[in-house]
Protein backbone atom coordinates (compact mmCIF):
# COMPACT_ATOMS: atom_id res chain seq x y z
CA UNK A 1 0.00 0.00 0.00
CA UNK A 2 2.94 2.31 -0.42
CA UNK A 3 2.19 3.68 -3.88
CA UNK A 4 -1.42 4.61 -4.23
CA UNK A 5 -3.63 5.72 -7.07
CA UNK A 6 -6.64 6.99 -5.23
CA UNK A 7 -9.75 8.53 -6.66
CA UNK A 8 -10.59 11.46 -4.45
CA UNK A 9 -13.98 11.83 -2.86
CA UNK A 10 -15.48 14.68 -0.87
CA UNK A 11 -15.16 14.24 2.85
CA UNK A 12 -18.49 13.33 4.29
CA UNK A 13 -19.67 10.55 6.51
CA UNK A 14 -21.16 8.47 3.70
CA UNK A 15 -18.66 6.02 2.32
CA UNK A 16 -18.09 6.25 -1.42
CA UNK A 17 -19.54 3.10 -2.91
CA UNK A 18 -18.18 0.45 -5.21
CA UNK A 19 -14.79 2.05 -5.68
CA UNK A 20 -11.92 -0.27 -6.45
CA UNK A 21 -8.77 1.01 -4.81
CA UNK A 22 -5.45 0.46 -6.46
CA UNK A 23 -3.12 0.60 -3.53
CA UNK A 24 -0.44 -0.84 -5.75
CA UNK A 25 0.38 -1.30 -9.39
CA UNK A 26 -1.59 -4.57 -9.45
CA UNK A 27 -4.96 -4.67 -11.12
CA UNK A 28 -7.47 -5.08 -8.34
CA UNK A 29 -10.21 -7.32 -9.53
CA UNK A 30 -13.70 -7.27 -8.20
CA UNK A 31 -14.80 -9.95 -5.75
CA UNK A 32 -17.37 -12.22 -7.32
CA UNK A 33 -20.61 -10.92 -5.91
CA UNK A 34 -22.92 -13.34 -7.62
CA UNK A 35 -24.81 -15.73 -5.49
CA UNK A 36 -27.57 -16.35 -3.06
CA UNK A 37 -28.42 -19.34 -0.96
CA UNK A 38 -29.86 -21.29 -3.87
CA UNK A 39 -27.20 -21.04 -6.56
CA UNK A 40 -23.74 -22.47 -7.01
CA UNK A 41 -21.75 -19.37 -6.07
CA UNK A 42 -19.97 -21.17 -3.32
CA UNK A 43 -17.70 -24.12 -3.75
CA UNK A 44 -16.74 -26.26 -0.82
CA UNK A 45 -13.02 -26.73 -1.24
CA UNK A 46 -11.10 -25.72 1.84
CA UNK A 47 -8.31 -23.24 1.17
CA UNK A 48 -4.91 -24.85 1.47
CA UNK A 49 -2.58 -21.87 1.49
CA UNK A 50 -3.48 -20.56 4.92
CA UNK A 51 0.00 -19.36 5.86
CA UNK A 52 -0.69 -20.68 9.36
CA UNK A 53 1.29 -23.64 10.70
CA UNK A 54 -0.32 -26.92 11.69
CA UNK A 55 -2.17 -27.26 14.93
CA UNK A 56 -0.22 -29.08 17.63
CA UNK A 57 -1.55 -32.48 18.54
CA UNK A 58 -4.72 -32.35 20.54
CA UNK A 59 -4.80 -34.47 23.68
CA UNK A 60 -8.45 -34.88 24.66
CA UNK A 61 -7.63 -37.20 27.56
CA UNK A 62 -4.83 -35.15 29.04
CA UNK A 63 -4.37 -35.56 32.80
CA UNK A 64 -6.30 -33.13 34.94
CA UNK A 65 -9.11 -32.83 32.43
CA UNK A 66 -11.61 -34.48 34.78
CA UNK A 67 -12.13 -31.34 36.84
CA UNK A 68 -13.84 -29.80 33.81
CA UNK A 69 -16.74 -32.22 33.88
CA UNK A 70 -18.53 -30.37 36.63
CA UNK A 71 -19.40 -27.43 34.41
CA UNK A 72 -20.59 -28.78 31.08
CA UNK A 73 -22.90 -26.38 29.33
CA UNK A 74 -25.56 -28.61 27.89
CA UNK A 75 -27.19 -27.30 24.76
CA UNK A 76 -30.89 -26.64 25.06
CA UNK A 77 -33.18 -24.94 22.57
CA UNK A 78 -31.91 -21.45 21.87
CA UNK A 79 -34.40 -18.59 21.52
CA UNK A 80 -32.43 -17.09 18.62
CA UNK A 81 -32.96 -18.36 15.10
CA UNK A 82 -31.19 -17.29 11.92
CA UNK A 83 -31.70 -17.85 8.20
CA UNK A 84 -28.95 -17.92 5.58
CA UNK A 85 -29.94 -15.22 3.07
CA UNK A 86 -26.81 -14.76 0.96
CA UNK A 87 -23.29 -15.92 0.27
CA UNK A 88 -20.54 -14.71 -2.01
CA UNK A 89 -16.93 -15.48 -2.71
CA UNK A 90 -13.92 -13.21 -3.09
CA UNK A 91 -11.90 -13.90 -6.22
CA UNK A 92 -8.48 -14.34 -4.60
CA UNK A 93 -9.62 -17.77 -3.27
CA UNK A 94 -7.39 -17.38 -0.21
CA UNK A 95 -8.65 -17.77 3.37
CA UNK A 96 -10.54 -14.83 4.86
CA UNK A 97 -9.13 -14.62 8.37
CA UNK A 98 -11.05 -11.63 9.73
CA UNK A 99 -14.42 -9.89 9.56
CA UNK A 100 -15.73 -6.93 11.56
CA UNK A 101 -18.91 -4.87 11.40
CA UNK A 102 -18.45 -1.16 12.05
CA UNK A 103 -20.23 -0.65 15.38
CA UNK A 104 -19.49 3.10 15.42
CA UNK A 105 -22.00 4.00 12.73
CA UNK A 106 -25.06 6.04 13.66
CA UNK A 107 -28.56 4.61 13.80
CA UNK A 108 -30.10 4.53 10.36
CA UNK A 109 -26.70 4.34 8.63
CA UNK A 110 -26.16 1.32 6.38
CA UNK A 111 -24.56 -1.68 8.09
CA UNK A 112 -20.97 -1.87 6.87
CA UNK A 113 -18.50 -4.70 7.45
CA UNK A 114 -14.89 -5.33 6.42
CA UNK A 115 -13.19 -8.59 5.49
CA UNK A 116 -9.45 -9.31 5.42
CA UNK A 117 -7.58 -12.12 3.69
CA UNK A 118 -4.71 -12.50 1.25
CA UNK A 119 -3.34 -8.97 0.60
CA UNK A 120 -6.91 -7.65 0.32
CA UNK A 121 -9.16 -5.51 2.52
CA UNK A 122 -12.78 -5.30 1.34
CA UNK A 123 -15.72 -3.24 2.59
CA UNK A 124 -19.34 -4.30 2.09
CA UNK A 125 -22.75 -2.88 2.92
CA UNK A 126 -25.72 -4.99 4.01
CA UNK A 127 -29.10 -4.12 2.54
CA UNK A 128 -32.58 -5.55 2.93
CA UNK A 129 -33.64 -8.77 1.22
CA UNK A 130 -30.22 -10.24 1.94
CA UNK A 131 -28.28 -8.02 -0.46
CA UNK A 132 -24.55 -7.57 0.17
CA UNK A 133 -23.15 -4.63 -1.80
CA UNK A 134 -19.43 -4.22 -2.52
CA UNK A 135 -18.25 -0.76 -1.41
CA UNK A 136 -14.48 -0.66 -1.68
CA UNK A 137 -11.52 -2.98 -2.05
CA UNK A 138 -7.91 -2.27 -1.13
CA UNK A 139 -4.88 -4.28 -2.24
CA UNK A 140 -1.50 -4.15 -0.55
CA UNK A 141 1.45 -3.34 -2.81
CA UNK A 142 3.23 -6.43 -1.49
CA UNK A 143 1.69 -9.58 -2.97
CA UNK A 144 3.09 -11.57 -0.03
CA UNK A 145 1.17 -9.58 2.60
CA UNK A 146 -1.53 -11.69 4.22
CA UNK A 147 -3.97 -9.71 6.37
CA UNK A 148 -5.13 -11.57 9.49
CA UNK A 149 -7.10 -9.00 11.47
CA UNK A 150 -9.00 -5.71 11.31
CA UNK A 151 -10.64 -3.30 13.78
CA UNK A 152 -12.91 -0.26 13.37
CA UNK A 153 -12.65 3.09 15.11
CA UNK A 154 -13.41 6.71 14.17
CA UNK A 155 -11.51 9.96 13.85
CA UNK A 156 -12.32 11.93 17.01
CA UNK A 157 -12.09 15.23 15.08
CA UNK A 158 -13.97 14.48 11.86
CA UNK A 159 -16.06 11.47 13.00
CA UNK A 160 -14.92 9.64 9.86
CA UNK A 161 -14.84 5.86 10.26
CA UNK A 162 -11.32 4.41 10.29
CA UNK A 163 -10.26 0.81 9.74
CA UNK A 164 -7.01 -0.65 11.10
CA UNK A 165 -5.64 -3.76 9.38
CA UNK A 166 -2.55 -5.90 9.94
CA UNK A 167 -1.13 -9.32 9.19
CA UNK A 168 1.90 -11.36 8.25
CA UNK A 169 4.25 -8.44 7.56
CA UNK A 170 3.72 -6.88 10.99
CA UNK A 171 2.70 -3.47 9.62
CA UNK A 172 -0.46 -1.77 10.94
CA UNK A 173 -2.30 0.27 8.32
CA UNK A 174 -5.05 2.80 9.05
CA UNK A 175 -7.53 3.24 6.19
CA UNK A 176 -10.01 6.13 5.91
CA UNK A 177 -12.89 4.81 3.76
CA UNK A 178 -14.26 8.35 3.26
CA UNK A 179 -11.12 9.70 1.59
CA UNK A 180 -10.27 6.16 0.45
CA UNK A 181 -6.68 6.44 1.55
CA UNK A 182 -4.30 4.55 3.77
CA UNK A 183 -3.62 7.55 6.03
CA UNK A 184 -0.99 6.08 8.38
CA UNK A 185 1.02 2.98 9.03
CA UNK A 186 2.93 1.77 12.07
CA UNK A 187 6.00 -0.44 12.04
CA UNK A 188 7.33 -1.77 15.32
CA UNK A 189 6.43 -5.40 15.82
CA UNK A 190 9.22 -7.74 14.80
CA UNK A 191 6.84 -10.23 13.24
CA UNK A 192 3.25 -10.96 12.17
CA UNK A 193 0.33 -9.26 13.95
CA UNK A 194 -2.43 -11.66 14.99
CA UNK A 195 -5.06 -9.30 16.44
CA UNK A 196 -5.97 -5.61 16.64
CA UNK A 197 -8.37 -4.07 19.16
CA UNK A 198 -9.46 -0.49 19.85
CA UNK A 199 -10.07 0.75 23.39
CA UNK A 200 -13.82 0.74 24.23
CA UNK A 201 -13.77 4.36 25.48
CA UNK A 202 -10.85 6.00 23.67
CA UNK A 203 -11.02 5.68 19.87
CA UNK A 204 -7.31 6.51 19.54
CA UNK A 205 -5.86 3.70 21.66
CA UNK A 206 -5.04 0.71 19.49
CA UNK A 207 -3.80 -2.60 20.88
CA UNK A 208 -1.83 -5.00 18.67
CA UNK A 209 -0.62 -8.51 19.53
CA UNK A 210 2.13 -10.30 17.70
CA UNK A 211 4.12 -13.36 16.82
CA UNK A 212 7.08 -11.46 18.37
CA UNK A 213 5.67 -12.46 21.83
CA UNK A 214 4.59 -8.89 22.74
CA UNK A 215 1.55 -6.62 22.85
CA UNK A 216 1.81 -2.95 21.89
CA UNK A 217 -0.47 -0.03 22.76
CA UNK A 218 -0.49 2.82 20.23
CA UNK A 219 -2.01 6.30 20.23
CA UNK A 220 -3.07 6.82 16.61
CA UNK A 221 -3.89 10.51 17.16
CA UNK A 222 -0.31 11.44 18.07
CA UNK A 223 1.35 8.43 16.37
CA UNK A 224 3.06 7.34 19.57
CA UNK A 225 3.82 3.89 20.95
CA UNK A 226 2.47 4.17 24.50
CA UNK A 227 3.65 0.82 25.87
CA UNK A 228 5.05 -2.61 25.09
CA UNK A 229 3.72 -5.50 27.19
CA UNK A 230 6.16 -8.40 27.25
CA UNK A 231 9.64 -9.39 28.30
CA UNK A 232 10.68 -10.97 31.58
CA UNK A 233 7.30 -12.43 32.57
CA UNK A 234 5.54 -11.86 29.25
CA UNK A 235 4.38 -14.43 26.73
CA UNK A 236 6.98 -17.04 25.71
CA UNK A 237 5.55 -17.59 22.22
CA UNK A 238 3.20 -15.94 19.71
CA UNK A 239 0.45 -13.80 21.26
CA UNK A 240 -2.71 -14.81 19.39
CA UNK A 241 -5.49 -12.71 20.92
CA UNK A 242 -6.27 -10.00 23.46
CA UNK A 243 -9.27 -8.04 24.66
CA UNK A 244 -10.03 -4.92 26.70
CA UNK A 245 -12.62 -5.19 29.45
CA UNK A 246 -15.76 -3.07 29.04
CA UNK A 247 -14.32 -0.05 30.87
CA UNK A 248 -10.96 -0.29 29.14
CA UNK A 249 -9.08 -0.66 32.43
CA UNK A 250 -7.64 -4.13 31.84
CA UNK A 251 -6.33 -6.25 28.98
CA UNK A 252 -6.36 -10.05 28.90
CA UNK A 253 -3.99 -11.66 26.40
CA UNK A 254 -3.40 -15.27 25.35
CA UNK A 255 -1.15 -17.21 23.05
CA UNK A 256 0.75 -20.24 21.89
CA UNK A 257 2.43 -20.69 25.29
CA UNK A 258 -0.98 -21.92 26.61
CA UNK A 259 -1.10 -18.95 28.99
CA UNK A 260 -3.52 -16.11 29.67
CA UNK A 261 -2.14 -12.88 31.12
CA UNK A 262 -3.83 -9.84 32.68
CA UNK A 263 -2.34 -6.37 32.14
CA UNK A 264 -3.83 -3.37 33.98
CA UNK A 265 -3.84 -0.11 32.06
CA UNK A 266 -5.52 1.91 34.83
CA UNK A 267 -2.36 1.86 36.97
CA UNK A 268 -0.83 5.24 37.79
CA UNK A 269 2.12 4.42 35.51
CA UNK A 270 -0.06 3.56 32.51
CA UNK A 271 -2.55 6.41 33.01
CA UNK A 272 0.39 8.79 33.07
CA UNK A 273 1.90 7.21 29.93
CA UNK A 274 -1.41 7.58 28.05
CA UNK A 275 -1.69 11.23 29.13
CA UNK A 276 1.90 11.89 28.05
CA UNK A 277 1.21 10.28 24.66
CA UNK A 278 -1.52 12.89 24.08
CA UNK A 279 0.75 15.73 25.20
CA UNK A 280 3.61 14.64 22.96
CA UNK A 281 4.24 16.91 19.96
CA UNK A 282 7.25 16.01 17.77
CA UNK A 283 7.22 19.53 16.30
CA UNK A 284 7.95 21.04 19.71
CA UNK A 285 10.67 18.68 20.89
CA UNK A 286 13.70 16.82 19.59
CA UNK A 287 13.32 13.94 22.00
CA UNK A 288 11.54 10.76 20.90
CA UNK A 289 8.50 9.63 22.88
CA UNK A 290 9.52 7.22 25.65
CA UNK A 291 7.37 4.07 25.54
CA UNK A 292 6.70 2.14 28.74
CA UNK A 293 8.12 -1.39 28.88
CA UNK A 294 5.78 -3.53 30.95
CA UNK A 295 7.61 -6.77 31.78
CA UNK A 296 5.29 -8.12 34.48
CA UNK A 297 1.61 -8.98 34.00
CA UNK A 298 -0.83 -8.43 36.88
CA UNK A 299 -1.96 -12.06 36.73
CA UNK A 300 -0.98 -15.11 34.69
CA UNK A 301 -2.25 -18.68 34.38
CA UNK A 302 -1.62 -21.82 32.33
CA UNK A 303 -4.30 -23.82 34.15
CA UNK A 304 -7.21 -23.24 31.76
CA UNK A 305 -6.03 -24.78 28.50
CA UNK A 306 -3.54 -27.43 27.40
CA UNK A 307 -2.89 -26.08 23.94
CA UNK A 308 -2.58 -22.83 21.95
CA UNK A 309 -5.08 -20.28 23.32
CA UNK A 310 -6.27 -18.50 20.18
CA UNK A 311 -9.20 -16.33 21.30
CA UNK A 312 -10.08 -14.45 24.49
CA UNK A 313 -12.92 -12.05 25.40
CA UNK A 314 -14.10 -10.40 28.61
CA UNK A 315 -17.69 -11.05 29.73
CA UNK A 316 -18.13 -8.62 32.61
CA UNK A 317 -15.47 -9.68 35.13
CA UNK A 318 -15.39 -13.19 33.67
CA UNK A 319 -13.18 -14.43 30.86
CA UNK A 320 -14.19 -16.50 27.84
CA UNK A 321 -11.26 -18.23 26.15
CA UNK A 322 -10.77 -21.11 23.74
CA UNK A 323 -8.05 -23.42 22.58
CA UNK A 324 -8.15 -26.15 19.90
CA UNK A 325 -9.97 -28.43 22.36
CA UNK A 326 -13.58 -28.04 21.19
CA UNK A 327 -14.67 -25.90 24.14
CA UNK A 328 -14.91 -22.23 25.07
CA UNK A 329 -14.14 -22.01 28.79
CA UNK A 330 -15.75 -19.45 31.10
CA UNK A 331 -13.49 -18.69 34.07
CA UNK A 332 -12.20 -16.02 36.40
CA UNK A 333 -8.85 -15.32 38.07
CA UNK A 334 -8.75 -16.20 41.76
CA UNK A 335 -11.56 -17.73 43.77
CA UNK A 336 -15.26 -17.27 43.03
CA UNK A 337 -15.69 -14.53 45.64
CA UNK A 338 -12.49 -12.61 44.75
CA UNK A 339 -12.71 -9.10 43.31
CA UNK A 340 -10.90 -9.02 39.95
CA UNK A 341 -9.46 -5.60 40.74
CA UNK A 342 -7.83 -6.90 43.92
CA UNK A 343 -6.22 -9.99 42.39
CA UNK A 344 -2.47 -10.03 43.06
CA UNK A 345 0.16 -11.05 40.47
CA UNK A 346 1.11 -13.93 42.77
CA UNK A 347 -2.45 -15.36 42.69
CA UNK A 348 -2.35 -18.97 41.52
CA UNK A 349 -6.04 -19.89 41.75
CA UNK A 350 -8.51 -19.84 38.89
CA UNK A 351 -12.22 -20.64 39.03
CA UNK A 352 -13.72 -22.44 36.03
CA UNK A 353 -17.44 -21.67 35.84
CA UNK A 354 -18.35 -23.77 32.85
CA UNK A 355 -17.73 -24.42 29.21
CA UNK A 356 -19.44 -24.25 25.85
CA UNK A 357 -18.83 -27.52 24.04
CA UNK A 358 -18.89 -27.97 20.27
CA UNK A 359 -17.22 -30.30 17.75
CA UNK A 360 -14.80 -30.39 14.81
CA UNK A 361 -12.86 -27.29 15.75
CA UNK A 362 -9.39 -28.52 16.60
CA UNK A 363 -7.35 -26.34 14.25
CA UNK A 364 -6.03 -23.07 15.68
CA UNK A 365 -6.79 -19.43 14.79
CA UNK A 366 -10.56 -19.90 14.86
CA UNK A 367 -12.11 -16.92 16.64
CA UNK A 368 -15.46 -16.48 18.36
CA UNK A 369 -17.36 -13.22 18.73
CA UNK A 370 -20.16 -11.69 20.76
CA UNK A 371 -22.83 -9.21 19.78
CA UNK A 372 -22.68 -5.60 21.02
CA UNK A 373 -24.80 -6.28 24.12
CA UNK A 374 -22.99 -9.54 24.89
CA UNK A 375 -26.22 -11.52 24.73
CA UNK A 376 -25.04 -13.89 21.99
CA UNK A 377 -21.83 -15.77 21.33
CA UNK A 378 -20.95 -17.18 17.89
CA UNK A 379 -18.22 -19.53 16.69
CA UNK A 380 -17.68 -21.42 13.45
CA UNK A 381 -15.91 -24.78 13.14
CA UNK A 382 -13.62 -26.28 10.52
CA UNK A 383 -16.42 -27.89 8.49
CA UNK A 384 -18.56 -24.77 8.02
CA UNK A 385 -20.94 -25.17 10.95
CA UNK A 386 -21.88 -22.15 13.09
CA UNK A 387 -22.72 -22.32 16.79
CA UNK A 388 -24.70 -19.51 18.44
CA UNK A 389 -25.21 -19.48 22.21
CA UNK A 390 -27.75 -17.44 24.14
CA UNK A 391 -25.84 -15.80 27.02
CA UNK A 392 -28.93 -14.24 28.62
CA UNK A 393 -29.27 -16.89 31.29
CA UNK A 394 -28.82 -16.53 35.03
CA UNK A 395 -26.77 -19.69 35.32
CA UNK A 396 -24.06 -19.99 32.67
CA UNK A 397 -24.49 -23.79 32.73
CA UNK A 398 -27.92 -23.27 31.16
CA UNK A 399 -26.63 -21.41 28.08
CA UNK A 400 -28.64 -22.59 25.10
CA UNK A 401 -27.13 -23.27 21.69
CA UNK A 402 -28.40 -23.22 18.14
CA UNK A 403 -26.43 -24.70 15.24
CA UNK A 404 -26.51 -23.08 11.81
CA UNK A 405 -25.58 -25.11 8.74
CA UNK A 406 -25.85 -24.65 4.98
CA UNK A 407 -25.23 -27.54 2.60
CA UNK A 408 -22.83 -25.45 0.51
CA UNK A 409 -20.80 -24.11 3.43
CA UNK A 410 -18.13 -26.67 4.23
CA UNK A 411 -14.89 -24.74 4.73
CA UNK A 412 -13.40 -23.65 8.06
CA UNK A 413 -15.12 -20.54 9.44
CA UNK A 414 -12.27 -18.33 10.69
CA UNK A 415 -14.28 -15.52 12.28
CA UNK A 416 -17.82 -14.24 12.74
CA UNK A 417 -19.24 -10.76 13.37
CA UNK A 418 -22.66 -9.48 14.46
CA UNK A 419 -24.07 -6.18 13.25
CA UNK A 420 -24.50 -3.71 16.11
CA UNK A 421 -28.27 -4.31 16.24
CA UNK A 422 -27.65 -8.10 16.22
CA UNK A 423 -29.89 -8.52 13.18
CA UNK A 424 -27.13 -9.92 10.94
CA UNK A 425 -24.36 -12.45 11.52
CA UNK A 426 -21.54 -12.66 8.97
CA UNK A 427 -19.13 -15.61 8.78
CA UNK A 428 -15.94 -15.76 6.68
CA UNK A 429 -14.22 -18.94 5.54
CA UNK A 430 -11.00 -20.55 4.35
CA UNK A 431 -12.33 -20.78 0.77
CA UNK A 432 -12.78 -16.96 0.58
CA UNK A 433 -16.55 -17.27 1.02
CA UNK A 434 -18.73 -14.89 3.04
CA UNK A 435 -22.03 -16.05 4.55
CA UNK A 436 -24.84 -13.78 5.68
CA UNK A 437 -27.30 -15.07 8.30
CA UNK A 438 -30.26 -12.83 9.20
CA UNK A 439 -31.93 -13.15 12.57
CA UNK A 440 -35.61 -14.12 12.49
CA UNK A 441 -37.62 -11.93 14.83
Swiss-Prot record:
Keyword Cell wall biogenesis/degradation (UniProt): no
* Domain topic, free-text comment: The WD repeat domain mediates recognition of trimethylated histone peptides at the consensus sequence Ala-Arg-Lys-Ser. This is achieved through an aromatic cage encircling the methyllysine, and involving Phe-97, Tyr-148 and Tyr-365.
* N6-methyllysine modifications at: 66, 197, 268, 284
Expression is induced as follows: Expression is induced by E2F1, E2F2 and E2F3.
Illness association: Cohen-Gibson syndrome: An autosomal dominant overgrowth disorder characterized by accelerated osseous maturation, advanced bone age, skeletal abnormalities including flaring of the metaphyses of the long bones, large hands with long fingers and camptodactyly, scoliosis, cervical spine anomalies, dysmorphic facial features, and variable intellectual disability.
For the modification N6,N6-dimethyllysine, the affected residues are 66, 197, 268, 284
Q: What Pfam families does this protein map onto?
A: WD40 (PF00400)
Q: What is the effect of changing residue 193 to N?
A: Impairs interaction with EZH2
Query: What name has this protein been given in UniProt?
Result: Polycomb protein EED
At which residues is N6,N6,N6-trimethyllysine found? Answer: 66, 197, 268, 284
The entry's comment on post-translational modification says:
Methylated. Binding to histone H1 'Lys-26' promotes mono-, di-, and trimethylation of internal lysines.
**GO biological process, any:** oligodendrocyte differentiation
Tissue occurrence: Expressed in brain, colon, heart, kidney, liver, lung, muscle, ovary, peripheral blood leukocytes, pancreas, placenta, prostate, spleen, small intestine, testis, thymus and uterus. Appears to be overexpressed in breast and colon cancer.
Which PANTHER family does the record cross-reference, listed alphabetically?
A: POLYCOMB PROTEIN
- UniProt xrefs under SMART domains: WD40
Q: Which domain of life is it from?
A: Eukaryota
Which species?
Answer: Homo sapiens
Q: Which residues carry this modification: Phosphothreonine?
A: 55
Question: What are the N-acetylserine sites (modified residues) in this protein?
Answer: 2
Sequence ranges of Polar residues compositional bias: 45-61
Similarity remark: Belongs to the WD repeat ESC family.
Q: How does it assemble?
A: Component of the PRC2/EED-EZH2 complex, which includes EED, EZH2, SUZ12, RBBP4 and RBBP7 and possibly AEBP2. The minimum components required for methyltransferase activity of the PRC2/EED-EZH2 complex are EED, EZH2 and SUZ12. Component of the PRC2/EED-EZH1 complex, which includes EED, EZH1, SUZ12, RBBP4 and AEBP2. The PRC2 complex may also interact with DNMT1, DNMT3A, DNMT3B and PHF1 via the EZH2 subunit and with SIRT1 via the SUZ12 subunit. Interacts with HDAC, HDAC2, histone H1 and YY1. May interact with ITGA4, ITGAE and ITGB7. Interacts with CDYL. Interacts with BMAL1. (Microbial infection) May interact with the MA protein of HIV-1.
Q: Where is this region: Disordered?
A: 1-72
